[in-house]
Regions:
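Intrinsic disorder/low-complexity segments
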Residues: 99-116, 207-230
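N-terminal ordered "arm"
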Residues: 1-53
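Glycine- and acidic
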Residues: 1-3, 164, 251-254
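Short coil/turn segments at secondary-structure boundaries
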Residues: 71-76, 196-197, 282-288
């Protein structure tokens, strides 16, 4: 077995797929740089991320898989789970290899250019009996489930300048998946959604900024409405998080920039939350299932002033 070391990026993983075919190595263990190597392993091969190789592999996937299959890859990658690396690598490699169900003739362009049987490829991406496919599909489901929860559980605070701030810390990197939702729903007000765990966020401005240009990856990951036309959605990071005007531990905005009436609205929301609670029908177990405790620290109704 040949060990491949890569930089834990999607482009790096796609490059590893390309290199494994170029080097004609099928039995590959994919590890991230710095991970412990297995005993008695040969000298590892270090994958140098190459955007051209990654683009070529992705274009091959676009020919071989349905849109759902492509989304399964990109969405599962947002899980940031290292346990996904090997199954995802194996799954992508299987796409380009002849499948036992139906032989796929090789055409021009090598493995990444051949046209296989669509029915065969659809059978592969839906084959729950394949442990690699199942691992990728289950990971994709977990990410989509948290995406839905983020849409439900983000709580905003209003600053004096009219900007709304929402701080989150999801298990998975779901911000790129929810920005379209908030842009469609709150397109008449500026807002910032910040991921305290990953130290970045997205700012929606009412004023288009044509000087900003998107920098998409070959997979299209991270592209959403606002990029490419009006550039109202801007990815932001802070050089010094110690100076940000909000508390990363609970998402609370500093009192000196908080809108004068926002505290009143927070108190009203807590009062409403308590008022609609029917004590005789309280079900803490059900509540924890629908609203996991890990989200509470950023939710207004669960935090007193």
């Amino acid at each position: 077995m040949q060990v491949y070391l890569f930089d834990n990026t999607l482009d790096g993983l796609l490059t590893a797929v390309f290199d494994s075919f170029f080097r004609k190595q099928q039995d590959v263990m994919l590890l991230v740089e710095g991970e412990q190597l297995p005993l008695f392993a040969d000298e590892p091969y270090r994958v140098v991320t190459d955007s051209e190789k990654a683009t070529r592999v992705w274009k091959g996937l676009e020919k071989h898989l349905s849109k759902d299959g492509l989304h399964m890859i990109t969405i599962s990658w947002l899980s940031e789970e290292r346990a996904l690396n090997q199954p995802l690598f194996n799954f992508i490699c299987k796409v380009f290899r002849p499948h036992p169900l139906t032989p796929s003739p090789r055409g021009e362009g090598g493995a990444f250019g051949r046209e296989g049987s669509l029915n065969t490829l659809l059978s592969l991406e839906r084959n729950a009996s394949d442990e690699d496919v199942l691992a990728v599909r289950n990971t994709c489901r977990r990410v989509l489930h948290e995406q839905l929860r983020m849409k439900q559980f983000i709580r905003f605070q209003k600053a004096k300048d009219g900007t709304y701030l929402g701080v989150v810390s999801p298990d998975h990197n779901v911000l790129p998946l929810i920005i379209d939702h908030f842009q469609d729903r709150f397109n008449d007000q500026p807002w910032l959604i910040y991921d305290a765990k990953r130290h970045y966020g997205y700012y929606y401005s009412l004023t288009p900024n044509p000087s900003l240009t998107p920098n998409p990856s070959p997979t299209g990951e991270g592209n959403f409405k606002g990029e490419g036309s009006n550039y109202k959605v801007i990815r932001v990071t802070f050089e010094d998080e110690a100076s940000v005007p909000f508390d990363l531990s609970n998402g609370k905005m500093d009192a000196d920039i908080l809108s004068d009436n926002d505290q009143l609205f927070q108190d009203l929301w807590r009062t409403y939350f308590k008022a609609i609670c029917i004590k005789e029908r309280m079900n803490p177990k059900k509540q924890l299932s629908d609203m996991p405790r890990r989200y509470w620290k950023y939710m207004t109704e669960k935090n007193a002033t």
